[in-house]
Regions:
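Beta-propeller domains with acidic blade repeats across secreted/periplasmic ectodomains
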Residues: 1-198, 202, 207
Length: 207
């Protein structure tokens, strides 16, 4: 499976922990690997005033929700894409997987070498989760907050000038589709006989 953390776009866990748990005496090395080659990102939003680590602008600092695309709606060129939300920089990043042994390496998509799959000029755009929908579209949960950092990282003097809770009662969900795409009808799986449910396992949409 795939995962990440704040400064790392994408990890691949190539040894499921359930297998290692069978032998608690076994000394095991790394069970995951970094697949990406660069932690650069390309935001288009205005750089906001922050006292901590100004050099981190343009570097991934809040990667989350590593989501392999399994919808089929975006076409064959997206077949091995993994989407990653980056709320601090107001963007969604894409890595393309390339098999390497029992794991993968990944790289930026062609045409996205110096830009992102999705980036916003809105500093309130805070994508925090991505899912593939039954219609093949990408659905993005947008936290919609002015301040995304933990308050402990913001000096008291600055805290007094901003509303740390601004947007706490708001949020947005975005549906992302290719231009001109025709969305699939969503079948009622609960109405299908068993045979058709089995056939549905071969559908390009993994949902």
């Amino acid at each position: 499976w795939f995962g990440n953390n704040n400064p790392n776009w994408l990890w691949h866990y190539h040894v499921p922990l359930r297998y290692l748990a069978r032998n608690p005496q076994l000394a095991v090395g790394a069970t995951r690997r970094n697949t990406f080659s660069s932690n650069r990102c390309f935001p288009i939003s205005a750089k906001m005033e922050r006292p901590n680590n100004p050099q981190s602008y343009g570097r991934v600092t809040s990667a989350n929700s590593a989501t392999p695309y399994r919808g089929g709606l975006f076409g064959e060129s997206f077949a091995r894409s993994v989407f990653i939300s980056e709320p601090v920089h107001n963007l969604v990043h894409r890595e393309v997987l390339k098999p390497e042994g029992v794991s993968f390496k990944s790289h930026r998509a062609k045409g996205e070498e110096k830009n992102e799959f999705l980036a916003s000029t809105d500093n309130w755009f805070r994508p925090v989760q991505i899912k593939t929908g039954p219609d093949g579209a990408l659905y993005i949960a947008d936290m919609y907050r002015l301040i995304i950092e933990h308050p402990e990282w913001i000096p008291a003097a600055m805290q007094s000038r901003v509303d740390l809770r601004a947007g706490h009662d708001k949020g947005r969900i975005w549906r992302i589709v290719p231009k001109g795409a025709k969305l699939r009808k969503i079948p009622r799986l609960d109405k299908l006989p068993t045979q058709q449910l089995v056939w549905a396992l071969d559908h390009p949409n993994g949902w």
